[in-house]
Curated annotation (Swiss-Prot):
Gene Ontology cellular-component terms listed: cytoplasm
Native species: Synechocystis sp. (strain ATCC 27184 / PCC 6803 / Kazusa)
Protein known as: Elongation factor Ts
GO molecular function, one term: translation elongation factor activity
Homology family: Belongs to the EF-Ts family.
NCBIfam families: tsf
Job of this protein: Associates with the EF-Tu.GDP complex and induces the exchange of GDP to GTP. It remains bound to the aminoacyl-tRNA.EF-Tu.GTP complex up to the GTP hydrolysis stage on the ribosome.
A Pfam family this chain is assigned to: EF_TS
Matches recorded under InterPro entries: EF-Ts_dimer_sf, Transl_elong_EFTs/EF1B, Transl_elong_EFTs/EF1B_dimer, Transl_elong_Ts_CS, UBA-like_sf
Alphabetically ordered keywords of this record: Cytoplasm, Elongation factor, Protein biosynthesis
Keyword Kinase: no
Subcellular location: Cytoplasm
Region (Involved in Mg(2+) ion dislocation from EF-Tu), start-end ranges: 82-85
PANTHER family given in the database record: ELONGATION FACTOR TS, POLYPROTEIN OF EF-TS, CHLOROPLASTIC
Amino acid sequence: MAEITAQLVKELREKTGAGMMDCKKALKENEGDLEKSIEWLRQKGIASADKKSGRTAAEGLVHSYIHFGGRIGVLVEVNCETDFVARGDRFKDLVNDVAMQIAACPNVEYVSVADIPQEMVAKEKEIEMGRDDLGKKPANIKEKIVQGRIDKRLKELSLLDQPYIKDQNLTIEELVKQAIAELGENIQVRRFIRFNLGEGIEKAETNFAEEVAAAAKG
């Protein structure tokens, strides 16, 4: 396997316009082969998607999705650049897929890791640093373990980092980038809210056996 150097990453970025982390991942997946990495990025829609990421996306759809007999509901806003794309079936299918993903992911609270408040990140770090299993480890090792755990936790909260429910080999971010490549426009998941029936309502606890007995007495 070829060594994945900073120069190789830079060259791939210049050829594709993809982000640094995507380029590193592409090179790792393709054992440092530049041409295969370019093709890999194109197949995932990343190469063209990152070039469009700075363009204004002010059109789009607000979409609702109701699941499981009305027990779970989702509202999501996904933006694109033109009304023409927003009204097309490809974009509508993407928005519906994103809404279904949100319905299936009860732990997801933010669109991306970048949206998570810093105070929450700091709190997660404080919790992890205080865990008993890290007590005797050297400071540098402890820091790496803690950072790894925090990164994992933050990704659990991020919609874009979730494996796509219809294809576990894709993340939602990659799914969106594929649509960007196909439609030729910048597409952004802007915001969402998820409703669970009865969430936050304190329910009275009942004894099932007593309920049956009471019903039997008429």
